[in-house]
């Protein structure tokens, strides 16, 4: 018996269905990460992945290995947990985007931390992350993020409008 599942080959050929976004979830505990990945799987519209370690290098490696299109990172504002604060999670986002420029990154945090709103807004303004959610994450919000991700995947896969497929424009 193999412990590792074979990866499904990407959809290709005429009539192949558009590939679903690969959505990675990295929460503050492995149990919450598993629960989030299961929830994403039940929601549909993506291929979920749970990243059980929230160490920056581990997250970057796994996102790169799995070619994640979307990354959900949970924040933790407990005392003494700086690596899970806005700046620590933005560090992960920057490193993931260095390897996967098209990967969309969203931060999730619980209610009750209005003092963090300015930092979250600044992270979006600086394009370190694509967005955030404060409070309970709704299925509608995730579907919106998945739709945005699928749209950006489609845009990235299509040739520029002034270029014919299979041909390169001269610079």
Regions found by a protein language model. Give the residues of each.
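Two-component/phosphorelay signaling modules centered on CheY-like receiver
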Residues: 30-55
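Non-catalytic signal-transmission and effector/linker regions of two-component phosphorelay proteins
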Residues: 1-39, 138-171
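Conserved phosphotransfer microenvironments
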Residues: 70-99, 109-119
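A short helix->loop->beta-strand "cap" motif at the edges of active sites that frequently abuts
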Residues: 100-104
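Structural beta-sheet core signal
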Residues: 25, 106-107
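Acidic, metal-coordinating helix/loop segments flanking the phosphotransfer/catalytic sites
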Residues: 52-70, 80
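N-terminal cationic-hydrophobic initiation segments that often serve targeting/anchoring roles
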Residues: 41, 63, 97-98, 124
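Output/docking surface of receiver
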Residues: 48-54, 108-161
